[in-house]
Regions:
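Generic beta-sheet signal
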Residues: 21, 45, 93, 143-146, ...
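Alpha-helix/helix-capping structural signal
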Residues: 2, 48, 129, 186-187
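N-terminal glycine-rich phosphate-binding loop and ensuing alpha1 helix
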Residues: 1-59
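Conserved nucleotide-sugar donor-binding
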Residues: 179-188
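Short Gly/Pro-enriched turn/cap motifs at secondary-structure boundaries
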Residues: 9, 146, 171-174
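Short, flexible, basic/aromatic active-site loop/helix in glycosyltransferases
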Residues: 158-174
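Conserved beta-loop-beta/alpha segment of the NTase-like Rossmann-fold superfamily
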Residues: 52-160
Length: 188
């Protein structure tokens, strides 16, 4: 939903989840992660340039398959359809809407089941199934994946005016931060 101001050279044309990594949008990678853990029913909260996401999935076979266009007959033939087991609901939740407002807007699509939630611009190797299992066994309303971030900058070891060593982005200060992957009960 955010505007992606830190990566504006990409996001003036498309929303952050549609920025490509390895030839596929970040959003595709997120869905593949969840799908690998058995989650295949998705609700995508759209904000800024949400139509780009809608167009991507509306034309998914064009993006993922070999295609022959017969211009004289006005026909298109899709070869080797690469289908995913996904069911995707795309909801316009507004450009300026905060996270809680987006969840409220899609509540009718969620129903009364426990659900997973993540941001559309973060990738990870989170064990989604383990997160769901942990959430269910804890009987909590909300479970968040916490991570310890690396330091933001490399550190120089100095001896007087000379650099004597360098540590590339050492571990952070030991604090935990929101890893961006949640398991939530509808009561949220």
């Amino acid at each position: 939903g955010g505007l992606g101001t830190r990566i504006s050279e990409e996001t003036h044309l498309k929303p952050k989840p549609m920025i490509e990594i390895g030839g596929r949008p970040i959003l595709w990678h997120i869905l593949k992660l969840y799908s690998a853990h058995g989650v295949n029913d998705f609700i995508i909260c759209c904000g800024y340039r949400g139509y780009v996401i809608k167009e991507y999935f509306a034309n998914y076979f064009l993006h993922m398959s070999d295609i022959t266009f017969d211009m004289s007959a006005n026909k298109m033939e899709v070869h080797e359809r690469k289908a995913e087991p996904w069911r995707i609901t795309i909801v316009d939740t507004g450009e300026e809407t905060m996270t809680g407002g987006r969840l409220k807007r899609v509540a009718s699509y969620i129903g009364d089941e426990t659900f997973c939630f993540t941001y559309g611009d973060g990738l990870s190797d989170v064990d989604i199934k383990a997160s769901i299992d942990s959430h269910r066994s804890s009987k909590k309303t909300a479970t968040v994946t916490a991570v310890r971030p690396p330091g933001r900058f490399g550190i120089l070891d100095m001896e007087g005016d000379n650099v004597s060593g360098f540590v590339e982005k050492p571990d952070g200060d030991g604090g935990w931060i929101n890893g961006g992957f949640f398991v939530l009960d509808p009561a949220v």
